[in-house]
């Protein structure tokens, strides 16, 4: 019994080793298969890239055949021309920027002046509104005086009409007085006494006749009553 036990253990170890070797072989086979698959994928990818590159080459060839390539100048001349163009463009842009900045500053100054003028006009407008309010108050205060002045103007107009009537009446009265003076200067005729009629009875002595008075009393009466009538009519 003691001899069979080591043999069994050795057999078992051998079997285990064989199994391990088999597993390793299987793993190696799997790795090889994976490597082959990766190689195949890489080959396919390379084939695709080559196909794309071939397509790009064909497209570039077609484009080069269709478009005429310009004849480029010498590299040094191209650099000089590019430098000159860059200098001119930069100077142009700088001048445009300077002009824009000056215009912007001018606009700022104009805006400031406009705002100051607007503020001044606002202050003037406020002053004018206050002044107009004061004038309105003064006009309301003077309104009673204006009413009195209008009333006095109306009364003066009526008085002027009355004075005009009195002036006309005075002129007519003066004319009548002149006429009366002229009539008083004329010689009056003497009235002869009547002849006595022979009668049986003795005639009584005739009474002396009184001189006739000038005809100015009726005119005086008419002139004295006329102003009263005019005044009453008024």
From Swiss-Prot:
Any one of the GO BP annotations: lysosome localization
- Region labeled Disordered — which residues? 1-58, 184-234
- Gene Ontology, cellular component aspect: BLOC-1 complex; BORC complex; centrosome; gamma-tubulin complex; lysosomal membrane
Q: Does the keyword Coiled coil apply?
A: yes
Localisation per UniProt entry: Cytoplasm, Cytoskeleton, Microtubule organizing center, Centrosome; Lysosome membrane
Keywords assigned: Coiled coil, Cytoplasm, Cytoskeleton, Lysosome, Membrane
MF terms from GO for this chain are: gamma-tubulin binding
The chain's coiled-coil residues are 145-184
Feature: compositional bias, Low complexity? 7-55, 200-218
**InterPro entries membership:** BLOC1_su2 (IPR019269)
To which protein family does this belong? Belongs to the BLOC1S2 family.
Cite the record's note on assembly. Component of the biogenesis of lysosome-related organelles complex 1 (BLOC-1).
| Role played | Component of the BLOC-1 complex, a complex that is required for normal biogenesis of lysosome-related organelles (LRO). May also participate in the coupling of lysosomes to microtubule plus-end-directed kinesin motor. May also play a role in intracellular vesicle trafficking.
What name does the UniProt record give this protein? Biogenesis of lysosome-related organelles complex 1 subunit 2
Q: Please give the organism.
A: Dictyostelium discoideum
